[in-house]
Amino acid sequence: MSDPLYIFNRSQSEIVVESLLASSNLRSSMPTQQIQSLRVFVATWNVGGKSPHSGLNLDALLHVHSEFDVYVLGFQEIVPLNAGNVLVLGDNEPAAKWLAMINQSLNKSSSSSGGRLSPKTPSFGAGSMFFAKPSLKKISESFRTECRRKLKICNCSTFSEDIVRKYGRESCFRCPEGLVNQSGVLSDDEEDEDDDDDDEDEDEGGGKVASLVSNQMTMKYGLVASKQMVGIFLTVWMRKELIQHVSHLRISSVTRGIMGCLGNKGCIAVSLQLYKTSFCFICSHLASGEREGDERRRNLDVIEILKNTSFPRICRTSFTRVPDRITKHDRVIWLGDLNYRIALSYSETKTLLDKNAWDTLLNKDQLKIERDAGRVFKGWHEGKIFFAPTYKYSYNSDAYAGDTSKEKKNKRRTPAWCDRILWHGDGIRQLSYVRGESRFSDHRPVCSVFVVDVEVCEGKTGTRRQ
C-alpha cells in the first residue's frame, strides 16, 4: 500500500511544478523593458509682476519649431508681490493669460501638423479674452479636456491571480474615491485645489474660453499639470500621444515667504510617472537680497523645500514604489529664480562684465561657491554657463539697471545669474543651456534642453526621440 505521506508530497510537488511552469510562461509573454529617449524643454522666467500683453510672442522662447516631447515652463512674479496678492486673494488672471499664450505657440497650425488646423487660440485684439478677465480654471479645463480623458492616476500592474487571468488587458486600478472614475482615469468633475474661487457665473469671456479648443483631437500638445502659488506658476505640457502613458500625477507646494509661511517665496513641485520612469519638476523663487549672508537664507530655503515637499500616495498596489520625496524620483529638474548673486561689488562686477571675464565672475557666483562647499544642492548638476547674467535689467532695455544716468542709484543691483536650471538623477543629458533675449521683464528667461531616458514596456506605443 502506498504511503499516504508520499502521495501527499507527490501531489504538492506536482502543484509546485505546474505553478512554476505557469509563472515561467507568464514571464515569457510579458512585455520587456526598453529605454527610449525623449527631449524635454525647460524654461524659467521671472516676469517682474507684469501680465502678458497682446504683442508678446512666445514662439522664440519656446523654440516651437524644434518639436520637443515635453515642455516644463516655470514663472516667477506673474503677479506683483504686494500685500493684496500675498495676504489676501491671489490674482489668477495673468496665469490664465500665460496658459493661453503657451497653447497658442505650441498648438498653432504648422506644416508639420499634416495640414490639420490646430485649436483656436485667443486673438489678442479688441474683444478678445484679454479684455474679458479669463478664468484660469476654465482655460485649464479647455486645454485638458481630451488629455484628461487619457490621463491615468494609476497604471500599475500586479501579479495577483485576478491580473494573471486578465493578462493582456491594460491594468489601471481605481484610486482614492472622488479622484478617478470606474475606468481609472481622471474624472471630468475633478476640481483644481487652487481654483476654488473660480466658480462664479460665466462672464462674457466664457464664450472666448470655450472657443479656445474647437477641436481637441487636433491638439499637438496637451496640458498635463499647472499650479499657481501667488507669483510662482508651473505648467507641464506633453505631446498628446504621450499623455496616455502618464500616471501618479501629484502636485505639492512649499511656502518660504515672510516668516516662512507666505507664498511670495517657495516652490511648486509636480510629480508624475511617464511609462515606468518617475519625474519631479520643481519651480522655485528663493529669498532675495544681495547683502552678505543672504545666500544662507537661500540655502535654508532649498533645505526646507527638500525636507517639506511631499507627495501623497495614490497607488492602489502596496508593493509599487511611488516616490514621495523630491530626490527619490528617477529624474528631477529644478528651475527658477534661485536669487543667488555674485559676491563682488557692483563696480567690480561691471568691470569684469565689460571684459567678458565669465570664468572670473562665475568663480564668485554664490551658487557655485555654496555647491562647491557642499552646503546646498549636493549631488545635483548644472551645465556650464556661457551667457551673461540674467538680472537686473532696465525695463525694455539691454542695459543693466543703474547703468544709465536717468536711473537712481537706489535702483542699482549688481548683475547676477539669478535664474538657473539644475538636475538630479541618472539618465539625463543636457544638450543646451542658454538665455532668451526678451526685454519684457527685468530678468532674462533661461532655457535648457535635455535628452531624458525613459523606461518603457516593449509593445507600448511611443516615439523614440534622439
Swiss-Prot record:
Region spans: Catalytic 2 = 411-426
Output the InterPro entries linked to this UniProt entry. Answer: Endo/exonu/phosph_ase_sf, IP5P_plant, IPPc
Q: What are its E.C. numbers?
A: 3.1.3.-
Q: Which UniProt keywords apply?
A: Hydrolase
Location of region: Disordered: 183-209
GO molecular function terms here? inositol-polyphosphate 5-phosphatase activity
Give one GO biological process term.
phosphatidylinositol dephosphorylation
Question: Annotated region Catalytic 1: where?
Answer: 330-345
- Bias category Acidic residues: which stretches? 187-204
For this protein, the record's SMART domains field holds: IPPc
Query: What is the similarity comment for this entry?
Result: Belongs to the inositol polyphosphate 5-phosphatase family.
Record protein name field: Type I inositol polyphosphate 5-phosphatase 10
Organism whose genome encodes this protein: Arabidopsis thaliana (Mouse-ear cress)
